[in-house]
Swiss-Prot record:
EC annotation from Swiss-Prot or TrEMBL: 7.1.1.2
Family: Belongs to the complex I subunit 5 family.
Transmembrane spans: 7-27, 64-84, 114-134, 140-160, 163-183, 208-228, 230-250, 277-297, 301-321, 338-358, 398-418, 437-457, 486-506, 511-531, 555-575, 615-635
Molecular-function annotations in GO: NADH dehydrogenase (ubiquinone) activity
Species in which this protein is naturally found: Patiria pectinifera (Starfish)
Compartment(s) where it occurs, according to its Swiss-Prot or TrEMBL record: Mitochondrion inner membrane
GO biological process, one term: electron transport coupled proton transport
A cellular-component GO term for this protein: mitochondrial inner membrane
Tagged with keyword Magnesium: no
Catalysed reaction equations from the record: a ubiquinone + NADH + 5 H(+)(in) = a ubiquinol + NAD(+) + 4 H(+)(out)
Protein name (Swiss-Prot/TrEMBL): NADH-ubiquinone oxidoreductase chain 5
Amino acid sequence: MNINPSIIILTINISIIITLLSSVFFFQNETNPSNLNSSSYSLGIFHNTSFNYLFSNSLFFTSLLKTLAILSLFPLFIEIIFNIPDTTVSLFNWLPNNGFSLNVEFRFDLKFNTFLSVALIVSWSILEFSYYYMDNDPNPNNFFRLLIIFLLNMIILTSTNNIFLLFIGWEGVGFLSFLLISWWTSRANANNSAIQAVIYNRVGDIGILLFFSLSITLFNTWSLPEIFSISAPNTFNNLLLVGLLIAAAGKSAQFGLHPWLPAAMEGPTPVFSIRHSSTMVVAGIFLLIRLSPLYACSSNFNTWCLILGSITAIFAATTAISQHDIKKIVAYSTTSQLGLMMVAIGLNQPSIALFHICTHAFFKAMLFLSSGSIIHSLNDEQDIRKMGGLHFILPNTAACIILGSLALSGIPFLPGFYSKDLILEIGLTNFSNFMGIVLSLLATLLTSVYSFRIIFFCFIKNPSFSPLAPINEENNNLTNSLNRLALGTILSGWILTNLTVLVPIITISSVLKTAALLLTITGVLFSISILQELTLNISPPTAYNTNSFTTNQWFYENISHILFLFYSFTISLSLSTRNIDRGWSENIGAQGIAITSSNASQSYQLSQTGYIKQYLLFSFLTLLIIIALSLTTISQLSPSFDI
């Protein structure tokens, strides 16, 4: 009996989605997190599997994600080995209508299977880390449940084959992001950051709503294959692409709609770790990857993506080198890498953008968890200038953050080298991409600068932290999650390059091919020389002005949050408040009627003086007016005589 491999892929993936959905409704008891693993050498693969132990100690979600992460590898390897085409399944027809049908349809292709495996492995590590990080939180189970729902919405967004379910996943990750950023509701900054994230994402949602409405209007369908097969008029097709670009820019924090991403670090470390690595911030890029047939032949759209991505990359890189908050540095590095993903979209290489998403997920999650470990161990200290010598008290965390920084810089044979350098090499094949690729190369140079800056201040510099800093690295929930991500960081680039990514043929010279690597080395040497000067208290003459510009994020927030808001408030005050509320509403509306009647009454009262002579005069004048009107009327009615 032959079993169709597509059936196996379909069964496993549907089972994963249903299991995640069902798990949200289980496990309602409130218990405290505990140490999950009996051994620190198992990378968390082997847990105590007793049901009572799992249930009573809040280990259900971690064990579930561990099982699903291992299970998700089977569809990926089956599709690679048997070269299975895309597997599409329609579960049922929802809201049937005569001229329009909405099918709940999923598409399990190589892109989704690759992303699913990466997302589940990374989320497994993050959730296990959460048991260490959220140890004293009063309500950890709801936090874990929200993380699962967050992941589930991202899986729905990446697997759906119609726009309606895509919209559900799209709005789901946005709403869950708001809940998780503002998890610590007593913090005003966390609440403000959550609102800021919602507002900026609302701008992006204008684009996705434009795309949805035009799709149903032009194509009378929300099915992606049908949309791809129908050609729209050029004008409407441009509007579709504009909507996609606005949506991706809002969700993936491209320049102009980026301020919410670094501000969102006010939430717990596991939140922005899962959001920056494998869920919300890559949703916009994955939207463009999934809808790549729409813009494959649109050179203008690709050019705009290239320009937007390169500006985002250089902006975030220049801002990161001036930050002192370790979480902000890693957050801006995420924005810079999102810019490189957008550059890959602009080069019409969506598969390479997905490749960078997958490799980026491992080392970025590891960097965030490592920074969380440092902050937790230093009593919530986040300033890298107050660190130094951390490898003495946190050797495992130190090794992981150094590995993540090297991977972020693009050191050979680490994942950043495989994916990031590939994007730059493809861009160098065509000099029409000159400006965008030059900015991307400069961003790569600065990436190595701020990556080495983290290493210098955290480990090479003399210790500056409190001598009473607690040592928390003996917790296996921390070490296993970090070590698992470190293993993924080391192996993911090589595995994905050889198994899932179809690398295009690149014909460039050896000098250009090594440009990214040379820039990385140059950046490290440059940062070493600058840090030595700063150590000797030698300040470059232009350091203050440059630092002020980059520290203040190119003054973008000063312009957008202060000037724009001031002028919008002024215009609203003059047009709306003064002209409408205090203008038409008061002078013509309810208050206007009262004022008019009051003025008429006051004018009439002037004639009521009580003098008999005045009354006789008014009566005589009234009589004369009546006589005059009567004579005029009689003369008009009498027949005319000829004289």
